[in-house]
């Protein structure tokens, strides 16, 4: 669960977020949409502590993110941005498995999870895992970005 409790963010004199409160229950998919400059990216960057709130508290799993080790916090989450951010020199499999591999996750569990995620995003692993991002459509790249975020 992610919870924002009366979060505000100001850059100089520019108030980007004002007294934002919401809860995202575990397992939910959430899309943040809005006009340019309304605070979407700022909100995401506050969740993983790239930006500190001016006021309010943010909790993940009931724990204040300020009390969490920043590296562990960032490694424990993934989110999909508008640009896919896939590594063009890596295959789809390598893109999905990069974070688990860097985190020294069990290789067999990682392979199994990759297959599960390909199913989740509706892409045949036999057809796509050995392809490179440049061989995929924009929508397919976005789905691989979703799979990587959940890896």
Residue map of PLM features:
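The feature captures the beta-strand-to-loop junction immediately N-terminal to the Walker
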Residues: 33-35
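Helix-to-loop junction immediately C-terminal to a conserved catalytic motif
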Residues: 48
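Conserved ABC transporter NBD signature motif
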Residues: 56-64, 73, 113
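ABC ATPase NBD coupling module
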Residues: 64-78, 102, 107-108
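Short helical segment in ABC ATPase nucleotide-binding domains corresponding to the A-loop/adjacent helical element
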Residues: 93-101, 111, 115
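Conserved ABC ATPase "signature" region
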Residues: 108-127
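Conserved ABC ATPase signature
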Residues: 131-136, 140
């Amino acid at each position: 669960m992610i919870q924002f409790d009366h979060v505000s963010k100001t850059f100089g004199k520019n108030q980007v977020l004002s007294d934002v409160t919401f809860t995202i229950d575990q397992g939910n998919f959430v899309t943040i949409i809005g006009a340019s400059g309304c605070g979407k990216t700022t909100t995401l960057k506050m969740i993983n502590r790239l930006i500190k709130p001016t006021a309010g508290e943010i909790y993940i799993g009931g724990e204040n993110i300020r009390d969490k080790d920043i590296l562990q916090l960032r490694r424990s989450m993934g989110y999909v941005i508008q640009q896919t951010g896939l590594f063009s020199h890596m295959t789809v499999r390598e893109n999905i498995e990069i974070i688990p591999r860097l985190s020294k996750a069990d290789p067999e569990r990682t392979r199994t999870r990759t297959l599960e995620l390909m199913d989740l995003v509706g892409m045949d692993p036999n057809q796509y895992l050995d392809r490179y991002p440049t061989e995929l459509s924009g929508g397919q790249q976005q789905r691989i970005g979703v799979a990587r975020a959940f890896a």
